[in-house]
Structures are given as C-alpha cells and as structure tokens.
C-alpha cells in the first residue's frame, strides 16, 4: 500500500474519533494494537498470501471482541476493502499522524557516552524549541565512533554536532 492510502485511512479514523469525542481512547487502542502487532508479528501474518482470507478474518474477529465501536467499524472497513495486509502500516501511520497533530515525537540523541538525566532534560528542552514539539521522549544511543559531541534526529530532521563530522569538515577544507 502506498503511504498516501495509509494516510487516507488513518485520517478517516482520526476524524471519526474526533467527531465522536473518542480521540484519546482510539489512540490508546491504536497504540495497543501496534504493540500487539509487533509482539506477535501480525503484520507479516496478514500480509502473507499463504494464509486464507478466512484465517485473517478470524484474527480481525478476535480483535473486534475487545475493540470500541469506532475501532470495530474501522477494522471492518479495512477487512471489507481488502486492506488487511496493510493494517499494520495504517496503524503506524495513524500514530504518526496523531503525534504530528499533538506535536509529540521520539528524539534520538547519539552520543559517544551515555547521557545523564540532567543532559537528557536539556536535550528535551532543546528538541521542544528546535523542532516545535509539545512532548518529547529522548532515546539515547551510544556510538563511540562519533568521538564526541552529539547527533540529534527527530523524524528525519538532524542536528549533527559530532566531533567526527566537525573533523571531516576541517579535513575537507584543508584538502
């Protein structure tokens, strides 16, 4: 499925949830389903043509047992439109669209050593202002190859203040 189609389905779900005043509840359901899909590799199951439509439909019936009315209608629409193979992607796109709506993001900070809590808080504040976000979760990744400094990545926007990059720039200027 194309990203455009995933966006259409996710936008429709978010609009209906908003109209019914159930946006927060639906987003909770979406997060739970994403987790369920990851833990049980359900996306691969639904995308695999080896399994019959009825087997995949049984999975949706199981999900419907614990779903709200809005989510149930959404899942039934996905099933009737033959988009079960794309359900995982649609759920991820729904989460991304909601994160954009509420200005929420995970921010990866790559550093040569683990960051302290105080440093993480500073990166949260910096990311909120630089990327215009309301809520930030900092994910610290240690990579000794950057030598020092840091690289901040939030949804494709990158701030590279690593020593390795600065040295490479100096070397390029000299040569």
Swiss-Prot record:
Topology in the lipid bilayer: Peripheral membrane protein
Location of the protein in the cell: Cell membrane
Main location: membrane
Cell membrane found in the keyword field: yes
A GO CC term assigned to this protein in UniProt: proton-transporting ATP synthase complex
Gene Ontology MF terms in the entry: proton-transporting ATP synthase activity, rotational mechanism
Top-level taxon of the source organism: Bacteria
Keyword tags: ATP synthesis, Cell membrane, CF(1), Hydrogen ion transport, Ion transport, Membrane, Transport
HAMAP family in the cross-refs: ATP_synth_delta_bact (MF_01416)
Annotated family: Belongs to the ATPase delta chain family.
Function: F(1)F(0) ATP synthase produces ATP from ADP in the presence of a proton or sodium gradient. F-type ATPases consist of two structural domains, F(1) containing the extramembraneous catalytic core and F(0) containing the membrane proton channel, linked together by a central stalk and a peripheral stalk. During catalysis, ATP synthesis in the catalytic domain of F(1) is coupled via a rotary mechanism of the central stalk subunits to proton translocation. This protein is part of the stalk that links CF(0) to CF(1). It either transmits conformational changes from CF(0) to CF(1) or is implicated in proton conduction.
Subunit structure: F-type ATPases have 2 components, F(1) - the catalytic core - and F(0) - the membrane proton channel. F(1) has five subunits: alpha(3), beta(3), gamma(1), delta(1), epsilon(1). F(0) has three main subunits: a(1), b(2) and c(10-14). The alpha and beta chains form an alternating ring which encloses part of the gamma chain. F(1) is attached to F(0) by a central stalk formed by the gamma and epsilon chains, while a peripheral stalk is formed by the delta and b chains.
Descriptive protein name: ATP synthase subunit delta
Protein's organism: Lactococcus lactis subsp. cremoris (strain MG1363)
Organismal lineage: Bacteria, Bacillati, Bacillota, Bacilli, Lactobacillales
Gene transcribed to yield this protein: atpH
